[in-house]
Amino acid sequence: MENQIKANNKKEFDEWFKPFSEKLQLRSNLTNSASLCDRVPDLALAEMKMALATDDKEKDSIFSNALVEATRFCAPIYECAWTCSTGVVQKSLSWFDKNKDFIKLWDAKYMDLKKGIPEPEQLVSYQQAAQKWRKDVGYEINQFTRSLTHPVVAEYKVPGEIAVDVKEMLSDMIRRRNVLLNGDGENAGKKGPISREHVSWGRELAGGKFQVVFNPPWGDINKCGKSGIPLAATAMVKVAELDGSKKLEDIRQALLDLKKWVEDNKDALEDGKGNELVQTMTKHLAQAVELSKKSNALRAQGAQIDTPFSAYYWAWSAGVKPETFFTLSQFLFEMGQSARGGKKMIKALTSTPLRWGKGLINLFADDDFLGNRLYMHPAVLTPGRMSEMGACFGVIPVASPEDAILGSGHSKNILNFKIDTSVQNPCASTIVQLYRIQKSGFDLESLEVVSTEHLLHQSFVGKRCPTQNAYKVRGNATNVNII
């Protein structure tokens, strides 16, 4: 047995894929990239079962099975086959061998990242590595395997019957974001939009114009916004969010220049006021750095996971070789046939005689992870993130590709559903069905991760296929207008 998707480049792959796709009779009326899907999944039975369920184990099983059912036939077959082709497999696994120094900042700290949220530099380094992998391997062969650079969508159209649900999900995303940035106290959720004028002030400061601190557009340099956070700090955070975290270092340098100017021009300032201003701005910058770390933690959520890159990193770390890749593909394909909870997943991985089974278990995040799991580093594996691997390697069992006709459900592939209202936005419609099931069985406010909101957020970001990278998408997806 071996990988049957034999292709070293796009030309060879297209030659392999043409007869394969004809045999599978792929369709694209409901999905962005051609799939096996011929109808929008009907999950009404799962919703009824959830309403009658009495214990968490049963509820988990119902929801997990609904996820598999919802995504069983919607995967982008072309992109999944390309991701698993012999050339991409060989190049990707050898890429990590050759680029150990390039991934060192987070790979060498993997044990720490299994326990807590990452530093901003570790997130940036991950994305730089993902971009390098994509370029070196020649991964991006069409619009559904590329890195996105567009602004987030301003409007998101949904059918009237699900509009209330989508708006409810969006409101909860905003609430969770504000709790993360502002804490869980009485000011949580009060964070308002940051004005363009304030952002311009922050950009000028980052550009070296320290004189702007003498007369900020909001008046008193210590003035706070609704959240209780100084406006100077929130302006700095926004600049870092829009233009990159290096801007905070630029602001630090501007404040050092300010300090020197104050020392050299004491006669031009009221007694003690110059040093007081420097100290105040230094405090505001320190607060901005901490807020930026939290904001970066938010940006680390799954919308920023480069799914194929992480999948190959986990495979490489677990000891998968090109010769054994087909066994991992088969395991993940079977995983998408019927839902498995975390315990069953670990049992199955423990039971396999293949070394990569134990290797994957050793990569799993700690049970006592410090912080919200939604914000863990995108290179850290969890039982839930096994579905990320499945979305890439488990749709087509590479040793017997024709078996793909049986379908294999992995949640991230829901993004391949179209968002066109001409076909009733099957992406949002399917996510809402899952949300209703989840809402019926669980107290969503108490959950660290609401997986359905997470999927909808990625649709807002503009991901139309799990094989795309969305890190460079500009703007805040939660500012979208639902119509």
Swiss-Prot record:
Which coenzyme or cofactor does it need?
Answer: Mn(2+)
Indicate the annotated site residue(s) for Homooligomerization: F214, L277, P353
List, alphabetically, the GO terms of the cellular component aspect: helical viral capsid; ribonucleoprotein complex; viral nucleocapsid
Cofactor comment text: Stimulated by divalent cations such as Mn2+, Co2+, and Mg2+.
Domain of life, source organism = Viruses
Which InterPro entries does its entry note? Nairo_nucleocap
UniProt PTM:
Cleaved at the DEVD motif by host CASP3/caspase 3 in mammalian cells giving rise to cleavage products that remain associated. Only the monomeric form is cleaved. Little or no cleavage in tick cells. Caspase cleavage reduces the viral polymerase activity. Caspase cleavage is not required for productive infection in mammalian or tick host cells.
Signal peptide annotation:
none
Q: Where in the cell is it found?
A: Virion
Tell me one Pfam family matched here. Answer: Nairo_nucleo
Motif extent (DEVD):
267-270
Keywords annotated in UniProt: Capsid protein, Helical capsid protein, Ribonucleoprotein, RNA-binding, Viral nucleoprotein, Virion
A Gene Ontology molecular function term of the record = RNA binding
Q: Where is this site: Cleavage by host CASP3/caspase 3?
A: E270, D271
Notes concerning its domains: The DEVD motif is a CASP3/caspase 3 cleavage site essential for viral replication in host cell. However, the importance for viral replication is apprently not linked to caspase cleavage. This motif is involved in homooligomerization.
**Subunit (UniProt):** Probable homooligomer; forms a double superhelical polymer. Monomer.
Instruction: Tell me the protein family, please.
Output: Belongs to the nairovirus nucleocapsid protein family.
Protein purpose: Binds dsRNA and ssRNA and probably participates in the packaging of viral genome. In the dsRNA binding mode, the nucleocapsid protein specifically binds to the vRNA panhandle secondary structure formed at the termini of viral genome. Does not discriminate between viral and nonviral RNAs through ssRNA binding mode. Displays dsDNA endonuclease activity that is sequence non-specific.
Question: Could you identify this protein by its name?
Answer: Nucleoprotein
Species for this entry: Dugbe virus (isolate ArD44313) (DUGV)
Tell me the name of the encoding gene.
Answer: N
